[in-house]
C-alpha cells in the first residue's frame, strides 16, 4: 500500500516535476518487539495466535510498580496504551490485556536479520536503533527502477522472509523520510517530498513534528502556533527569542530543512544502543534504573549476538522540557556482559541526571571490538568469568526455548502470568 507515485528520470522526479539528487528511505519495524515475538511464535507453530491481532503488549515486571510497556499491538493502541507506560495503567485501560515478557536475544537476532536485508540493497545504511534504519538510496534508480515500487518490494520481502511488517518513508532527507514513515501504519510505503509538504506535512498538529516534545508544543500553542505549517511560517527571530537555539531547529524542521547525512559507522566505531520515550515523567532513581536494566538487556544481547565487546557506555536523558543531557563513561576493559554495561549505565545516569522529570532514556555503547581485554585481580577475574558464562548460558536458553525459560528475578512475576 503506497501513498503516492512518481516517475523516475535522470534523478528522482518529485511532484511538480522537480528533479532531486538525494533519495533517502527510513525503514521502521512496526511494533518491533511484539512483531518479532509474533513472527517467532508463528514460525514455531503456524496455528499459534498472532499477538498482533489481539490486545497484547510486551512488558517488564508486571507486579512491580515500575514495570513498563515496551511494545503494543494495534488493537491495544486503540485503548490509549502507550510505549513506556506503566503496566498497571495499561491494565486499567484494557483489563483483558495479554502481557508477554521480553525476549532480548530474539530482538537482537531479528534486528540483525532485518539489517542484513537492508545491507543487500542499500549503498549506505545508518542504523539509528534496534528497529529502524536510514538507507541512502541516491543513484539507485537505474538499478532498481521506481523508488516507490522498489520500496514496496522491499517491505514485502522483509515480511515474506522474516514474518514482520515495516513502514518505509521516502524523501530527499532524513527528517522528511522519518516523518513519512510515521504516517499511517502498518505495512505501508509513504512519500514526503518537498513539494508534498503543504498537503501532507504542514496540516499536522505541531506535536507531530519530530523533536517537538509536549512541553515545547504547549509553549508553541500558547503563542498561537498549532500546526507544523504555522510553525514554518512563524517569525524565526521570535522563535529564537522564545526557544533559544531550539528555535532554529523548530523552524528549519517545519520547513523540511535537514542537512544530516546518512552515515554508516565503520566496524571499528560500531556501537549498539536502545532508547525509550516515556509518556509519563520518571522522577525517581529506582524507576530510572529499572528502565535502564531493560535497555541494557537488549543492548547486551545484541553485542553478544555479534560476538563483540564494547568499552564505552553512554546514557542519554531527555527531560520534559526537551533538554538533552548525556553522560559517557569509559570502561577499564572491553566487555559484553550485561551486568557490567548496566553498572556503567547506572553510574553514568547518577552522575548526569539533574533530577528534572525524564521523558526519554537511552543507553548506547561504542568502541566495539571483536576481542575482550578484561583485566581484573584474581577475585574479579573469577567473578567476570562466572558472569560471562552466565550471560552466554542465558542467551542460549532464551534462543532455544524463548525468554520464558529463564528470567531475572525482577521479571519473574510477569512470566508466571
Give the residues covered by each predicted segment.
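Acidic, metal-coordinating catalytic segment for phosphate/diphosphate chemistry
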Residues: 36, 333-417
Amino acid at each position: 500500500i503506497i501513498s503516492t507515485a512518481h516517475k523516475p528520470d535522470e534523478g528522482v522526479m518529485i511532484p511538480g516535476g522537480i528533479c532531486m539528487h538525494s533519495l533517502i528511505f527510513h525503514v521502521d519495524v512496526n511494533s518491533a518487539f511484539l512483531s518479532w515475538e509474533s513472527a517467532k511464535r508463528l514460525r514455531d507453530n503456524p496455528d499459534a495466535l498472532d499477538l498482533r491481532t489481539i490486545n497484547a503488549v510486551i512488558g517488564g515486571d508486571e507486579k512491580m510498580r515500575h514495570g513498563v510497556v515496551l511494545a503494543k499491538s494495534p488493537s491495544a493502541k486503540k485503548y490509549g496504551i502507550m510505549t513506556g507506560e506503566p503496566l498497571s495503567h495499561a491494565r486499567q485501560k484494557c483489563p483483558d490485556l495479554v502481557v508477554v515478557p521480553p525476549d532480548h536475544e530474539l530482538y537482537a537476532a531479528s534486528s540483525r536479520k532485518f539489517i542484513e536485508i537492508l545491507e543487500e540493497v542499500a549503498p549506505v545504511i545508518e542504523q539509528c536503533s534496534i528497529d529502524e534504519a536510514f538507507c541512502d538510496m541516491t543513484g539507485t534508480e537505474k538499478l532498481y527502477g521506481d523508488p516507490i515500487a522498489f520500496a514496496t518490494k522491499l517491505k514485502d520481502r522483509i515480511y515474506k522472509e522474516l514474518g514482520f511488517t515495516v513502514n518505509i518513508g521516502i524523501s530527499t532527507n532524513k527528517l522528511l523520510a522519518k516523518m513519512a514513515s510515521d504516517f499511517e501504519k502498518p505495512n505501508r510505503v509513504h512519500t514526503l517530498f518537498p513539494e508534498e509538504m503543504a498537503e501532507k506535512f504542514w496540516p499536522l498538529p505541531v506535536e507531530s513534528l519530530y523533536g517537538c516534545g509536549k512541553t515545547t508544543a504547549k509553549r508553541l500553542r500558547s503563542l498561537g502556533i498549532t500546526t507544523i505549517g504555522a510553525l514554518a511560517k512563524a517569525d524565526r527571530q521570535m522563535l529564537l527569542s522564545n526557544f533559544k537555539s531550539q528555535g532554529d531547529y523548530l523552524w528549519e524542521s517545519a520547513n523540511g530543512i535537514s542537512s544530516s547525512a546518512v552515515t554508516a559507522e565503520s566496524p571499528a566505531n560500531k556501537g549498539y544502543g536502545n532508547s525509550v520515550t516515556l509518556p509519563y515523567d520518571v522522577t525517581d532513581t529506582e524507576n530510572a534504573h529499572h528502565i535502564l536494566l531493560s535497555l541494557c538487556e537488549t543492548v547486551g544481547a545484541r553485542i553478544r549476538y555479534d560476538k563483540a565487546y564494547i568499552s564505552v557506555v553512554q546514557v542519554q536523558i531527555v527531560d520534559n522540557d526537551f533538554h538533552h543531557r548525556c553522560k559517557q563513561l569509559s570502561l577499564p576493559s572491553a566487555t559484553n556482559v550485561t551486568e557490567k554495561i548496566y553498572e556503567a549505565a547506572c553510574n553514568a545516569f547518577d552522575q548526569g541526571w539533574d533530577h528534572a522529570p525524564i521523558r526519554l532514556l537511552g543507553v548506547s555503547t561504542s568502541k566495539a571490538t571483536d576481542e575482550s581485554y578484561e583485566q581484573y585481580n584474581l577475585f574479579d577475574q573469577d567473578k567476570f568469568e562466572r558472569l560471562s558464562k552466565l550471560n552466554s548460558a542465558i542467551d542460549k536458553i532464551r534462543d532455544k526455548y524463548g525468554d520464558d525459560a529463564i528470567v531475572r528475578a525482577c521479571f519473574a512475576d510477569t512470566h508466571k502470568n
